[in-house]
Amino acid sequence: MSGEQTPMCSMDLREIKGKETNMADSYHGMSWYEQYIQPCVVELLGSALFIFIGCLSVIENSPNTGLLQPALAHGLALGLIIATLGNISGGHFNPAVSLAVTLVGGLKTMLLIPYWVSQLFGGMIGAALAKVVSPEERFWNASGAAFAIVQEQEQVAEALGVEIVMTMLLVLAVCMGAVNEKTMGPLAPFSIGFSVIVDILAGGGISGACMNPARAFGPAVMAGYWDFHWIYWLGPLLAGLFVGLLIRLFIGDEKTRLILKSR
């Protein structure tokens, strides 16, 4: 080999700086609507579609399929909707995910509350549509797809623990697959969907494997079922907080971590 070669590290630095400049230019070129309104509209739309499909899969679930039908419906629907709409809003459709993504720097803090509002309204719309298209008897037999599995105080600790752990897996899949630069990749929507399938199959019999306050809230409003509803807020939001701190402190890339930096 002849001639001088550009050092690889210098080349990489220039490429990285160029990418950062292009991303910044692209972001600043976006309109106010595209930065602040459009993502909230997409979060509302995506949440409505996801929760509509999820609720129907529970209401119309055959006893012979057990957890398989809702697990596949929730996971495949979420992966599909993220792949379709994720480039606009990030594809959260879940207040716990939005909390974690905000903590790791993937979402502007000022957008967190608007995202939550959009997701909750989307949840109500999706649950309302499911109620409209479902036979009344099946709807009420399934408690409107609300989470009614916890019936006794003795079940609370187990259900809360399952919600925390299962939601942590989902939120890790989102943050590491779609936000953290070192580990993000094009298969993130599928890994996120798979995490939902796995979570429901594993924990559905204990807590219902909600992992999403919006998924719990919409059906609860439509069915008027609020027993132990707080579990499906506290568990997922604690999980989002834990994962955000875990990534910020230990497993995030150099740009994301707050401690243990190389320089």
From Swiss-Prot:
Post-translational modification Cysteine persulfide, affected residues: C55
InterPro entries per the UniProt record, alphabetical: Aquaporin-like, Aquaporin_8, Aquaporin_transptr, MIP, MIP_CS
Statement: the UniProt record of this protein carries the keyword Transport: yes
Modified residues (Cysteine sulfenic acid (-SOH)): C55
One Pfam family here: MIP
GO CC term (a single one): plasma membrane
PROSITE patterns referenced in this protein's UniProt entry, alphabetically: MIP
Membrane-spanning ranges: 39-59, 87-107, 110-130, 159-179, 186-206, 231-251
Keywords: Cell membrane, Endoplasmic reticulum, Glycoprotein, Membrane, Mitochondrion, Mitochondrion inner membrane, Oxidation, Repeat, Transmembrane, Transmembrane helix, Transport
Subcellular location: Cell membrane; Mitochondrion inner membrane; Apical cell membrane; Basolateral cell membrane
Membrane topology per record: Multi-pass membrane protein
Motif (NPA 1): 94-96
Cytoplasmic topological intervals: 1-38, 108-109, 180-185, 252-263
Motif (NPA 2): 212-214
Activity control mechanisms: Reversibly gated by a two-step sulfenylation-persulfidation process in cells undergoing diverse stresses.
Comment field on protein domains: Aquaporins contain two tandem repeats each containing three membrane-spanning domains and a pore-forming loop with the signature motif Asn-Pro-Ala (NPA).
Family listed: Belongs to the MIP/aquaporin (TC 1.A.8) family.
Protein name (record): Aquaporin-8
Organism: Rattus norvegicus
Gene name in the database record: Aqp8
